[in-house]
């Protein structure tokens, strides 16, 4: 059964800027483009992230946040988007632009656990409707897999119609194509990743620990001896109240999700 932890809400703005301005601001040439992904304070403590990418004469920016975390924090999605747009890193990039589109989209992010029945009698399910959104943090595949599954569905449908059999069995070529083209194997291989990545410690606790370590190591100590890395790590884990056993367990779970 799906919960608010398995779904995210994306809200996006498309802002018009002339091509010359885009190329100048983002140091682009010809058909080049750029994509930025953001984590941290831009989502105000809500689990998720934000993005910005260029198009030919527009740029798109938005946030994608977990439904359960959004409800818990009692934050409106458009407030997060406005906060992101006003961030000192982002504001100069969108300055002078004109809003031409606003959209929202529910994103299935539970991976293997929420894949739908792909074929039935006279029916094929593709894209988000089938749960084919591959969001592991390390890899983000939404549009790509929607295109891949749509193409596979079209080919399977044509094959079934030519054979005169549009039953679930006659449409089995759809699943076969998704297997052969690596879509379904990816979901199986990284089946543990979505829950690990969207966990509270990965989204909240450990980023705080990492930034604390960086501050201890990189910030000037005002004449005091500089810290070595291991004492800085130990001190930050102690400050955050994270026992070493918990860290080792999370490293093991992260390895299972991504490493082997």
PLM-predicted stretches and their roles:
Residues 23-48:
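Rossmann-like NAD(P)H-binding beta-loop-alpha module
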Residues 40-47, 56, 69-149, 162-168, ...:
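FAD/FMN-dependent oxidoreductases across multiple families
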Residues 4, 8, 142-155:
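Gly/Ser/Thr-rich active-site loops/lids in small-molecule metabolic enzymes
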Residues 1-31:
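Central beta-strand plus flanking loop segment that forms part of the substrate or channel wall
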Residues 197-260:
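C-terminal auxiliary extensions adjacent to catalytic cores
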Residues 59-66:
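Short, well-ordered beta-strand elements
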